[in-house]
Amino acid sequence: MTDTFSFNVNSDDLQKRSDHIKMGIHQAPARSLLYATGQVSNPEDMKKPFIAICNSYVEIIPGHVHLRELADVAKQAIRDAGGIPFEFNTIGVDDGIAMGHLGMRYSLPSRELIADSAETVITAHWFDGVFFLPNCDKITPGMIMASLRCNVPSVFVSGGPMKAGLDPQGKATTLSSMFEAVGAFKSGLMTEEEFLEMEQNACPTCGSCAGMFTANSMNTLMEVMGIALPFNGTALAISDERRDLIRDGAKQLMRMVKENVKPRDLITKEALDDAMALDMAMGGSTNTVLHVLSIAHEAGIDYDQADINEIAKKVPYLSKIAPSSKWAMEDVHNAGGVPAIINELIRMGDVLHPDRMTVTGKTLRENVADHEIINDEIIRKFDVNPYSKQGGLSILYGNLAPKGSVIKAGGVDPSIKDFTGEAIVFNSEQEAVEAIDSGQIHAGHVLIIRYEGPKGGPGMPEMLGPTSAITGMGLGKEVALVTDGRFSGASRGISVGHVSPEAADDGPIALVENGDKITIDLVNRTMHLHVDDTELAERHEHLKPFVPKMRNGWMARYQALVTSANTGGVLKGADELFPS
């Protein structure tokens, strides 16, 4: 018999996972179907590794509209390296387009759908390796979660960031500039002509949005985690360098398949610590906290927000990127990129774990050894002039957030060390937006936007509209916003999100009333509601039970199963659903 007929799935010398679907006489029907795909031409092809390309090509997402072409580059590189590529696609949500309406409630939940769907295709077809091609917001963490569930040799190459746009004065812009322009236009600070010109030029190319928003935060973090190649987070989407990364990634994947290097070999507790250290150094999106916690959950790693706070205390803020400065991702790339930042952190001596292995087959230290800072205005040295001696994110605890909350400290004006204001309470984002638009918000207010958490929203929508409007109106240093929802990576200002427990879980944020005083202390990482425990207990007695908003569709199931932000907003697992 030929090798194809004599395959034994129980053999000790099993070499390829995909042999389960293509070898042995009983798999003849499967082989017929494989020939019908056109990807397999002859029995010799059946002996080659089967490689999945998990793409996320979606035409309504500018960060993904070019991924069909990049997948073709990856497929050819896999064939050249001796594999058989099979492309499949996942869904995707564009957070910028979905912002401020029902669509935003589907954004964070889409992460779970992406993880589930990728896990399904990869597991059902016994692929030998997976080339993940993500780019924006929830797609990247969803794919990482799937890779950990399947634990098959995997490499990640993102689609890359877009070029920065230009405003009417010729200054570089990103999507956050456009959101803030809405507030400026409404306040009479921008003419209609300027507004329309900016609208058409803020996002000039395909790629993820040009600042250090969620997409680029996650794509840079993958570099230091060791699951993506150097410069994955900064090489432009439209560049030849991006295509070279695709080709190199395919070659590395084929090596990893041969050596059986798997995601759980690379994504360790130390890798997650290093991811958050880089996030602190670059002032990344607050959403990275949610996603790193969810990645830890899938990897079976005990990880807590308190761990993140400890990292924040010792890692300096080295590269301030839009929306916190004028610099875009292409500027960071030209200044030395993420490898230069990693190298600077390694130079500190006790911040990273540089001897971990990565997808290159080399250690993190070896990957970045030759990469120095080229422009020390964009990437600063830790011992010369860091933006701050502590990282760009902070976890705040207190009686308003017993299980924690998150603020992008690097997006707050450096002159602000603490803020005390008077609560003005809204039970939805829409109510808050209407109040802002009608001029009800003034200096000294702390906007409370609640019942917008993972369960309450449902879906934990981003509050980019309210934060951008506040900034655009010139109140970014005089008004704070506190929510059990979350923020876009494009948000800045005194914006505290992820308040846990959320209002829908009877968290203290549900007890806040108009006029209550609230103090946000960035130095001591606390947030305090100035109401005594007796009064809070009395308010709790009169608190009305939360009524779920969704009664049909998959979001109703999501609302029933989702956990709190302090655990990453993942869905309840078997241990919680079926306790022993």
From Swiss-Prot:
One of its GO terms (biological process) is isoleucine biosynthetic process. GO terms for molecular function: 2 iron, 2 sulfur cluster binding; dihydroxy-acid dehydratase activity; magnesium ion binding. Its EC number is 4.2.1.9. One of its GO terms (cellular component) is cytosol. Transmembrane segments: none annotated. The keyword Iron applies. PROSITE patterns: ILVD_EDD_1 (PS00886), ILVD_EDD_2 (PS00887). [2Fe-2S] cluster binds at C136, C209. SUPFAM superfamilies: IlvD/EDD N-terminal domain-like, LeuD/IlvD-like. Gene3D superfamilies: IlvD/EDD C-terminal domain-like. Keywords: 2Fe-2S, Amino-acid biosynthesis, Branched-chain amino acid biosynthesis, Iron, Iron-sulfur, Lyase, Magnesium, Metal-binding. Its cofactor is [2Fe-2S] cluster; Mg(2+). The active site is at S488. Pathway: Amino-acid biosynthesis; L-isoleucine biosynthesis; L-isoleucine from 2-oxobutanoate: step 3/4; Amino-acid biosynthesis; L-valine biosynthesis; L-valine from pyruvate: step 3/4. Binds 1 [2Fe-2S] cluster per subunit. This cluster acts as a Lewis acid cofactor. It catalyses: (2R)-2,3-dihydroxy-3-methylbutanoate = 3-methyl-2-oxobutanoate + H2O; (2R,3R)-2,3-dihydroxy-3-methylpentanoate = (S)-3-methyl-2-oxopentanoate + H2O. Mg(2+) binds at D95, D137, K138, E462. The modification N6-carboxylysine is found at K138. The keyword Magnesium applies. Functions in the biosynthesis of branched-chain amino acids. Catalyzes the dehydration of (2R,3R)-2,3-dihydroxy-3-methylpentanoate (2,3-dihydroxy-3-methylvalerate) into 2-oxo-3-methylpentanoate (2-oxo-3-methylvalerate) and of (2R)-2,3-dihydroxy-3-methylbutanoate (2,3-dihydroxyisovalerate) into 2-oxo-3-methylbutanoate (2-oxoisovalerate), the penultimate precursor to L-isoleucine and L-valine, respectively. Belongs to the IlvD/Edd family. Homodimer. This is Dihydroxy-acid dehydratase.
